[in-house]
């Protein structure tokens, strides 16, 4: 999404802080922060990253340097601790994204290092996902957060948190979680379809038609498998 849209939507929705958590890099977050500075915007940008470990996804907030994907959860958590980042577990339960969900055994093992865990993700495709996510947070007594996971313009401002004091740094964020108010938006499954179309268009524009062909064939084969399975 263009930076100008993100900034405009944050102004329209009265968002004071936004965490940018691109996959496996902080370059986008840093670039957006610099863009906001050039525009002399009052929006505060939290530098973050959604890191794909071999054990599932972990988010870091208030980061100062990249952490590559493909490491173990242990290595990733260690690197996040070195830079004083908030260690945040996204969507701890999600059938649609089960390949990216951090293993519960890892949550159990590193419970003392994890600062917060989502009890609701803005891209949940069913209400039951949120209930399961909340159960996991309660089971391990980890502070709960709401994750916007916004990729499209109408997702902005639907899932937000209101802090008693400004989360100016990692410590302020962690200390404010107990009194933070969570606002959960409605489920909108159409956003998943829009994201897939957007991704396909970007690949087509780049000229990588072999990748387009691979995605279409995979989709057709998956549908055939589901039909075959249902007909048994």
Task: Give names to the regions the model predicted.
Residues 1-9, 27-38, 47, 51-69, ...:
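Charged catalytic cores and adjacent phosphate/nucleic-acid-binding surfaces used
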Residues 6-27, 85-88:
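Divalent metal-dependent hydrolysis catalytic cores, especially in the metallo-beta-lactamase
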Residues 15, 41-43, 85, 142:
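Short glycine/serine/threonine/alanine-rich loop segments
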Residues 19, 45-47, 88-90, 144-146:
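General beta-strand structural signal in soluble alpha/beta enzymes
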Residues 23, 91, 151:
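Histidine-centered divalent metal-coordination motifs
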